[in-house]
Amino acid sequence: MTLAGRETSRLVAIFATIFLIQIAVVPHFQLSGYVVDLPLILVVLVSLHLNPPNGALVGFLAGVLVDLVLHTPFGMTALTFSLAGYGTSSVASQVTERNIIVRSLTVALLSATATALFAGIGALIGLEYVTRRELGAIALVTAIAALPSTVLLSPLVRWVFPLETVQINE
């Protein structure tokens, strides 16, 4: 099945809304001094409904959008989100059919892993300020924020993808 224009426009609308919320609202509501990464959580949740190449594509496009406002090297977030989307889509067949609790825990675990991956990529390219922070605390805050975010965003993702698995290029 190919992704129709309706699904594409719905997905773009959701990502644009989450992006605007991320840059305008979320920085004012920090958990333990850290900002929650809503676009990452949405990439992981959406990738549960895609095959691995398409999950990587969605992650890349969302990451490029986020890279426009971050003070990290351009493409670092896109790379991290691409890998998160690919990895999430790879385990999607075991998780998509499960209940919301299992899905929330999976999104929390994968989001925390992607946060650690972001710090690892930063260390590889020599960004000390990314790895100096308390990585465990940042990953924990991301995981904790992913639990209610998944419950709130799941109906929107189901609205975008009425079928269980959608493949953009078949």
Predicted regions and their residues:
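Terminal, non-globular segments
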Residues: 1-170
